[in-house]
Amino acid sequence: MKILWIDLNSSYAHSSLALPALHAQIASNQDIEWIKVSATINENIGMIVDSIYRHHPDILAATAWLFNHEQLLHICTRLKALLPQSCLILGGPEFLGDNEAYLRNHPFVNCVFRGEGEEAFPQWLSCWNQPEQWAHIPGLCYIDSQQQYKDNGIARVQNFQALVPPEESYFFNWDKPFVQLETTRGCFNTCAFCVSGGEKPVRTLPIEQIRERLQLIHQHGIRNVRVLDRTFNYNTRRAKELLQLFLEFSPDIRFHLEIHPALLSEELKEELKQLPQGLLHLEAGIQSLHAPVLERSRRMGKLEDALEGLKFLCSLPNMETHADLIAGLPLYHLSEIFEDIRTCL
């Protein structure tokens, strides 16, 4: 079996964890040949198609994002015309909703995957060429032989701690200026604009397991780690444990964290004050300074607490903090966005 992964990014500075995360789970399977073709959304589509076509894969797979979806469709349309026997499966945040219209409008897409794939994708590979057996694959959406839409819900990894880390895949890219590290999956918050909103319970990795992964990252000389946790400080005790762990790698590694300024406990504030210069780069999730916008978006946390927390973070001389505002949220008008920018400045 030959799987070709279409790695389509906005630039070569960016890389996705999707391929190494999936490959790591079944890397020992000698019956599978993996190929990756990397490209950017600004490259010539014909050249990309040609570089893929020459491999004649059994399976074409890719992750669709907002920024690459249009170009990916153009590529896949041409590929399926040239390789009609190849099975095309797509995944990613673009498929978190109802996928029936998408599949009917793009019949060359054999199936799309909704949710977390590390456990379910290997299941699908065991029957990829037997669509009559797809009904038991969590997260898979497809049109069956009777032209009926089949929706297998959303896939959730049942044993997060047991996953093989993506760093152990030979597709993991150590050449980028930073690497991404996931220490939790899911989020306590319910933000309507986030793909993890309401994804409970939050699943965590043990501190010792994270330490081992950071040691490997350190051995590769990586200087910057972007922690992918949706809300680093959702739990004060765990946040403090992670900060103590990060200190073990200071000053060699700098950590980028997403933090909710409305949820800063006094205990965590004191911890942040004591950290060495440059250990952290904080991304404070403000999103909007207008309460109706936050309420409609179902974002938890009082606005007054968020402003107070942001002021505290910006006052810390030992770390860099930037605040996030999200244009396009419901009830969020352009004039209010400019007003919020002025307030933050």
Give, region by region, the residue ranges found by the protein language model.
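Proline-aspartate-enriched helix->loop->beta-strand connector
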Residues: 56-60, 222, 345
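Nucleotide-activated donor-dependent transferases that construct or modify glycoconjugates
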Residues: 2-11
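Radical SAM [4Fe-4S] cluster-binding motif and immediate context
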Residues: 161-317, 327-329
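Glycine-rich beta-alpha loop elements in corrinoid/cobalamin-binding modules
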Residues: 2, 18, 25, 34-153
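Short N-terminal binding/cap micro-motifs at the start of the first secondary-structure element
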Residues: 12-18
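Catalytic cores of alpha/beta
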Residues: 99-105, 270-272, 330-345
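Hydrophobic/aromatic residues located in beta-strands of well-ordered beta-sheets
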Residues: 3, 34, 88, 137-138, ...
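N-terminal [4Fe-4S]-dependent radical SAM core
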Residues: 1, 137, 141-180
